[in-house]
């Protein structure tokens, strides 16, 4: 196959023919790799797609191997070996295609096309919605539920895609063009059968060669895939492991003979990594925002490579070129063309910024306009269609830019004389298209295509081809390539790879279990076999059961961590979610076994439980089964719910119910009738009965306390009795089985029955986990809608109706042809709106970063300036140092050191107000999602403008900026999240506006303001930047993919290559000055219609596959332009007074506003966020109310018997369980605020870190007080603790004190959460610390074990635990100064010393006066009935609690709250506040649990 005459190394512009027959295209395109090494890797799109190698060969694989060879076993051809420097992915594809064709009966190649007709898509939402708040949340939720039952009601749905039609044959490459919100993503998702969140209307026809969408979903899912814009991967897997997993899941049964699955998978992984330039990252972790790994660009290529391995026939790519430069994006599209030409793949690609070279590779184009398809057809005829309509394509305007400009009224240019003839609205364009001859021809072609699919039975061929790939024992109609057992095996291997990649997690889990076993068992160390150990044996058994059960609680977090990835793999037909669930359960099993054995082995023997082998192994079996039960329960909850917030409340209530009704807190005989049924459906109750029956059965315990005892009382005989349930008069031993029967109503005969019930629950929950994980659909999007505050929604709808009526009734607009967007009035004051006379300049800026032991220079001697009224473009390839330079200039570096260079304003050094004197528009649009646009702008203006400016002036300035940036139509809209809130362009405008309202007196930095935007939005943003400069603003802006038209909006260019300057100067008209400079210095001539940006990147060797012909850094340093720059910098440095004027009073202040003003505004915003986050508030109140009510009515009006007092104590203790959930619920909210603050507001000096922390602490308190108040009334009175105050006549007083201590308890939970998250980067880590600290506190607070029973070593923890003082305060107020009345089973019965003669009161009088207690029959002479307690204070004394210490205990508890607040402030300052020129101290940067990771390379340091 001969090559074209195109120059080597230049991007292929290509000619294609006979696509449907699978013949390859003729041409050359360069590789993906940017290095100068001999091994150049090339980008490809599908498993067997590829490109021409970089060197020139005289013959191709097609001529060498007419029938193809097996490249896995035959290594004779180096061009087919991915480990060879001579590897050519294009030749590999050609060889594989020949191999498939050589035995088509075995390989059965088959591909799909798609035809759609009358396709209409609608969503269940309105085009604008109102924001959910605490006040309207319940009403809105009820309305949404009601609307789900309304059918075919247009009031509650809107069209996303209007009826459309198209035909894409196998081997054709199609581009989908349109602005954000046009429906491009919805169209691709519809074609890919991803219709969650919207509906395909009845009557719509979508045919994949005669196959329906239902058949695709159920039987051929992997043949049609959708690749989203974002990347989701397991961060702890390496690149090689990620791709190998996908390859194993898609390894076909009909692979080349003699090749194992593992060999095949390894080979294709090596091929795609070589193809995509990922070979060097094979053993590198993927990483994410918090775990170091590959770079963002490499992560994008990894996503592409993964889809490549799926081997889908129809691939729907949604803006997959985002973040790639123009040259790299071109190579990606070229690879898709290769795949289509050779293998008959059918890719559809939505691209927002498409170059002309890339566009020329497409066969067909779809143009979308606000849900209407206004053109479908040949990419070469699209421009002519709209030109014939009456529109003009400007000089240097690319065809895709022209096509998308048609959908923008402000940008399309109308041919003179056609002003009243061309369509204006989307509906008019749609009508024009539906009447066009192009559409009529398309409909005829679609009908013919559909008839042919039925006549030639193409459907059967596709199913046969799909079945040929499937492994043995795989269901014929399954979408998956390998069988379920194989899927589970590969998933288990992936799970272990993930565990190995983050080995600290399993090791810390094991270590945590050992530590908790040692702590718990040491508290109850070596219990003696006597009656005094009964309470401790049952309590430690209870706590051990709960620990074994709750050890799986974090699995609910894991369910959400990987859900997006599992759903993605399901859509790729790698495996069903049930396979992942089964695999993870089996993979978790060994770790559970190890943890369970270690914990229970240590606990069992240190506590001195029953020393019999059978008893030990039965204990181990029941404990482990309890762990499995709770694991499956948490997995079921996670599988059933769609978010962690949804799962928290039901899981917490279930935990509370299961632990309360396990049999220890409330024995069976004390359970109330209304809730006794819970015991029968509570597996932990069966487990607990089995455990303590196993412990007490067949044992006789010595008596440790005889009643009566002391001087004058006999030590033997029937007149004394053991003070224990189950004791008999005259007996000094207690039978274990009798104790169980009387105290718990338990019997040893039930232990194996209980084991069977426990296993039944495990099996049942395993089934429910599999069912829900397979059937649950993740949260769905409603489509892109604006969200307003409820009070503004009617006003906005009225405005929209008036505007629509006006547009429908008016005549067609008379366009002048100008592309200028509407501008703000240019009177003098408005021109001065952003005016500044300050000049920012820098010289010889050098920045280094230490990577391992190497000092790497990232920026090397950079010079430049930014003057008012000028827009300076900062350009270069990825990794050139653009963002790094912006961060260095704006003092935002988070690592590394500026080793030399100066940064000045008007010749003077930078002062402490510099950071708030500039605006920095970050690439990421970071905003608080609950704020409105106006609120976000006012917040920035009020805190960042000088304190001398009044609030009214600041607000007035905000309104001017709103008009300047044309944001008036959505100024009252909620920022929201993508899909429900502002769209991409609106978010970018808001990001710019937030910086402008601060009225930066120096300049504005913009980092990639057009990244991810469509070409028209990018053009709009650049026009906006130009407008700002015209108003006097100085601007420095990085830009990645500018078209020739966009470059006209910039005045100067700073061009970087590998951290060095290669040009700094003016663009000139039509970039003439720039072009002349490079051509004068040896560059090839710039073609007349070429994009100067792409040309200059190729000249300096920054584009893939290009090589610079000289060192342009040295060329620049020796040029006259460089000397002119140095002279100008010298002039600026010698003029320190230039336009500086009088210094403002706050010049040297880091913040414009005072601390108290900062604090007030931040607190106000926090209260707004809370009010507009009803899910958090509802969850908090639901937890407080439901748990309290459940607690209160579980222990409803507990009597003052000895068991009743224990019940009241455990009721108080159970309230502590709520603290963990309340604290963990708060953590994600804090993280949201902190991420915004640290990413945008702290670097811009909006407000101080102390104001941030103080506001966080303050904002929680009112809601905690309210939650505590509701909880108090829901619990205190149902339990009946108020009755204990009746005897002392202090019912009201003690009720108020109990409310006070409960309020402090709730406040403590929030301050503990704030302390734990203040120094932890991840919410999960903070949640673990919260759980650990509260668990230890609950062990040592004196309830599970009293102070006197603890080993002396642990007494210090008893005194240091805040819950000790909380328990003491609540129990003294709740139980003190009342009387005890024993239950019948608690009454000790024995005769006096001389029965029939001596009265009981005479016999027991001396004992009662010393030990307390009371007689029920003091006058009796035969059998004395004695209760060992008569006052509740005796019970408190046993617990080391005194009612007189309430004030002391409350005060100490308040000290703990204050300590948490102080520790929050100190730890945040220590670990997260920038110190000096560093964002975080070098020591703390090394602690992975404190700080995020990032990319291993330093493209954006």
UniProtKB/Swiss-Prot annotation:
Region annotation Disordered: where it falls in the sequence: 58-87
Residues at which ATP binds: 876-883
Topology in membrane: Multi-pass membrane protein
Compartment(s): Membrane
Principal location: membrane
CDD domains: ABCG_PDR_domain1, ABCG_PDR_domain2
Domain ABC transporter: 140-395, 840-1083
Chain ranges on the Cytoplasmic side, renumbered to this chain: 1-502, 776-1175
Protein name per Swiss-Prot or TrEMBL: Opaque-specific ABC transporter CDR3
Protein's organism: Candida albicans
Upper lineage: Eukaryota, Fungi, Dikarya, Ascomycota, Saccharomycotina
Encoding gene (name): CDR3
């Amino acid at each position: 196959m001969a090559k074209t005459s195109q120059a080597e190394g230049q991007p292929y512009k290509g000619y294609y023919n006979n696509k449907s027959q699978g013949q390859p295209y003729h041409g050359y395109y360069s590789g993906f790799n940017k290095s100068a090494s001999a091994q150049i890797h090339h980008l490809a799109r599908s498993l067997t797609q590829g490109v021409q190698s970089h060197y020139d060969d005289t013959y191709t694989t097609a001529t060498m191997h007419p029938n193809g060879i097996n490249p896995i076993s035959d290594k004779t051809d180096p061009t087919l070996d991915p480990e060879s420097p001579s590897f050519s992915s294009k030749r590999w594809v050609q060889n594989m295609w020949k191999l498939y064709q050589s035995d088509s009966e075995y390989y059965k190649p088959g591909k799909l096309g798609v035809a759609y007709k009358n396709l209409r898509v609608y969503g269940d939402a309105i085009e604008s919605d109102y924001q959910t708040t605490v006040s309207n949340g319940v009403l809105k939720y009820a309305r949404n539920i009601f609307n789900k039952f309304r059918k075919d009601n247009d009031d509650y749905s809107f069209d996303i895609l209007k009826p459309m039609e198209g035909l894409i044959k196998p081997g054709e490459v199609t581009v989908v063009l349109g602005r954000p919100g046009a429906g491009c993503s919805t169209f691709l998702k519809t074609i890919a059968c991803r219709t969650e969140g919207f509906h395909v209307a009845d009557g719509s026809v979508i045919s994949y060669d005669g196959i329906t969408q239902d058949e695709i979903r159920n039987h051929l899912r992997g043949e049609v895939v959708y690749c989203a814009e974002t990347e989701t991967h397991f961060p702890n897997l390496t690149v090689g492991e990620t791709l190998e997993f996908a390859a194993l899941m898609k390894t076909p049964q009909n692979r080349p003979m003699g090749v194992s699955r593992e060999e095949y998978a390894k080979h294709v992984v090596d091929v795609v990594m070589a193809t995509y330039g990922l070979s060097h990252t094979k053993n590198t972790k993927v990483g994410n925002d918090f775990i170091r790994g590959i770079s963002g660009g490499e992560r994008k290529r990894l996503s592409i490579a993964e889809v490549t391995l799926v081997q889908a026939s129809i691939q729907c790519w949604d803006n997959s070129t985002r973040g790639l430069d123009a040259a790299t994006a071109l190579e990606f599209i070229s690879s898709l063309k290769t795949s289509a030409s050779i293998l008959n793949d059918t890719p559809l690609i939505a691209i927002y910024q498409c170059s002309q070279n890339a566009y020329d590779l497409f066969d067909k184009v779809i143009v979308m306009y606000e849900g209407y398809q206004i053109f479908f057809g040949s990419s070469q005829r699209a421009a002519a269609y709209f030109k014939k309509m009456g529109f003009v394509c400007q000089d240097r305007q690319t065809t895709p830019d022209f096509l998308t400009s048609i959908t923008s009224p402000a940008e399309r240019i109308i041919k003179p004389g056609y002003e009243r003839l061309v369509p204006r609205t989307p509906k008019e364009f749609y009508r024009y298209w539906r009447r066009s001859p192009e559409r009529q021809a398309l409909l005829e072609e679609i009908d013919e295509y559909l008839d042919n699919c039925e006549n030639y039975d193409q459907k059967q061929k596709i199913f046969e081809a799909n079945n040929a790939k499937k492994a043995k024992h795989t269901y014929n109609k399954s979408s998956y390539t390998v069988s379920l057992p194989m899927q589970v095996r590969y998933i288990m291997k992936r799970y272990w790879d993930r565990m190995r990649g983050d080995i600290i997690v399993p090791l810390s889990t094991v270590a945590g279990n050992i530590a908790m076993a040692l702590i718990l068992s040491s508290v109850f160390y070596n219990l003696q076999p006597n009656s005094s150990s009964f309470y401790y044996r049952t309590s430690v058994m209870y706590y051990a059961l709960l620990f074994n059960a709750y050890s799986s609680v974090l699995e609910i977090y894991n369910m959400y961590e990987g859900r997006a990835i599992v759903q993605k793999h399901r859509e790729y037909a790698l495996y069903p979610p049930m396979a992942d669930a089964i695999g993870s359960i089996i993979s978790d099993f060994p770790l559970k076994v190890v943890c369970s054995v270690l914990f229970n082995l240590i606990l069992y023997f240190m506590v001195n439980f029953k020393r019999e082998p059978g008893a030990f192994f039965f204990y181990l079996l029941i404990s482990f089964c309890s762990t499995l039960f709770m694991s499956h329960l948490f997995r079921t909850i996670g599988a059933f719910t769609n978010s962690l917030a949804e799962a928290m409340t039901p899981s917490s209530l279930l935990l509370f119910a299961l632990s309360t009704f396990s049999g220890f807190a409330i024995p069976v005989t004390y359970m109330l009738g209304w809730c006794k049924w819970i015991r029968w459906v509570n597996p932990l109750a069966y487990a607990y009965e089995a455990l303590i029956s196993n412990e007490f059965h067949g044992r006789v315990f010595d008596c440790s306390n005889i009643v009566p005892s002391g001087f004058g009382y006999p030590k033997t005989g029937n007149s004394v009795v053991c003070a224990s349930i189950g004791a008999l008069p005259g007996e000094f031993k207690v039978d274990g089985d009798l104790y169980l029967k009387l105290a718990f109503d338990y019997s040893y005969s039930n232990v194996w029955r209980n084991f069977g019930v426990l296993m039944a629950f495990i099996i049942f929950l395993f089934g429910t986990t599999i069912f829900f994980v397979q059937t649950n659909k993740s949260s769905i999007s409603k489509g892109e809608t604006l969200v307003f505050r409820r009070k503004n929604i009617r006003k906005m709808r009225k405005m929209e109706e008036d505007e629509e009526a006006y547009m429908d009734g008016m005549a067609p607009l008379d366009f002048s042809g100008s592309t200028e967007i509407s501008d703000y009035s240019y009177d003098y004051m408005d021109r001065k709106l952003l005016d500044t006379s300050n000049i920012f300049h820098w010289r010889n800026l050098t920045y280094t970063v230490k990577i391992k032991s190497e000092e790497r220079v990232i920026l090397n001697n950079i010079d430049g300036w930014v003057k008012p009224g000028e827009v300076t473009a900062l350009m270069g390839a990825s990794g050139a140092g653009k963002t790094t330079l912006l961060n260095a200039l704006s003092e935002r570096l988070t690592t590394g050191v500026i080793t030399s260079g100066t940064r000045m304003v008007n010749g003077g050094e930078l002062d402490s107000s510099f950071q708030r004197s500039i605006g920095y528009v970050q690439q990421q649009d970071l905003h608080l999602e609950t704020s409105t646009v106006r609120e976000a702008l006012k917040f920035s203006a009020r805190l960042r403008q000088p304190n001398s400016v009044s609030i009214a002036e600041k607000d007035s300035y905000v309104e001017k900026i709103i008009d300047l940036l044309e944001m008036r139509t959505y100024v009252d809209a909620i920022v929201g999240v993508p899909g429900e809130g502002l769209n991409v362009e609106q978010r970018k405008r808001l990001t710019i506006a937030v910086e402008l309202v601060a009225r930066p007196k120096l300049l504005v930095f913009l980092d990639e303001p057009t990244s991810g935007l469509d070409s028209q939005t990018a053009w709009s943003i650049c026009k906006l930047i130009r407008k700002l400069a015209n108003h006097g603003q100085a601007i420095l802006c990085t830009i990645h993919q500018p078209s020739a038209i966009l470059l006209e909006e910039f005045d100067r260019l700073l061009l970087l290559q590998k951290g060095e300057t290669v040009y700094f100067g003016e663009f000139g008209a039509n970039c003439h000055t720039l072009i002349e400079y490079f051509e004068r210095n040896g560059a090839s001539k710039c073609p007349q219609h070429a994009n100067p940006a792409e040309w200059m990147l190729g000249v300096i060797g920054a584009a893939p596959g290009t090589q610079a012909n000289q060192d342009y850094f040295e060329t620049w340093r020796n040029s006259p332009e460089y000397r002119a720059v140095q002279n100008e910098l010298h002039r600026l440095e010698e003029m320190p007074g230039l336009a500086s004027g009088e210094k403002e009073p706050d010049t040297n202040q880091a913040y414009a506003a005072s601390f108290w003003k900062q604090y007030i505004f931040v607190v106000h915003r926090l209260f707004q966020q809370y009010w507009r986050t009803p899910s958090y508030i509802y969850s908090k109140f639901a937890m407080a109310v439901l748990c309290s009510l459940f607690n209160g009515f579980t222990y409803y009006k507990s009597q003052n018997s000895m068991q009743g007092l224990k019940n009241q104590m455990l009721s108080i203790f159970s309230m502590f369980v709520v603290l963990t959930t309340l604290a963990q619920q708060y953590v994600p909210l804090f993280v949201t605020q902190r991420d915004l603050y640290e990413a945008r507001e702290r670097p811009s000096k909006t407000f101080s870190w102390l104001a941030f922390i103080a506001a966080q602490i303050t904002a929680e308190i009112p809601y905690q007080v309210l939650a505590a108040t509701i909880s108090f009334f829901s619990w205190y009175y149902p339990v009946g603790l108020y009755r204990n105050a009746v005897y002392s006549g202090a019912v009201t007083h003690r009720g108020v004190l109990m409310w006070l201590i409960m309020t402090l308890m709730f406040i403590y939970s929030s301050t503990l959460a704030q302390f734990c998250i203040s120094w932890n980067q991840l919410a999960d880590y903070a949640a673990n610390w919260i759980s650990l600290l509260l668990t230890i506190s609950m062990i040592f607070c004196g309830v599970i074990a009293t102070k006197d029973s603890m080993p002396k070593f642990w007494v210090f923890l008893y005194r240091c635990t805040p819950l000790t003082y909380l328990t003491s305060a609540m129990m003294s107020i709740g139980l003190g100064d009342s009387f005890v009345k024993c239950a019948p089973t608690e009454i000790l019965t024995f005769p006096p010393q001389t029965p029939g003669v001596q009265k009981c009161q005479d016999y027991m009088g001396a004992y009662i006066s010393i030990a307390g207690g009371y007689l029920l029959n003091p006058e009796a002479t035969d059998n004395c009935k004695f209760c060992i307690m008569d006052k509740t204070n005796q019970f408190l004394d046993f617990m080391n609690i005194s009612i007189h210490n309430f004030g002391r205990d409350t005060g100490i508890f308040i000290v703990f709250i204050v300590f948490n607040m102080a520790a929050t402030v100190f730890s945040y300052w220590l670990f997260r506040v920038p110190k000096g020129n560093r964002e975080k101290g070098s020591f703390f940067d090394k602690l992975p649990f404190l700080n995020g990771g990032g990319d291993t390379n330093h493209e954006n340091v």
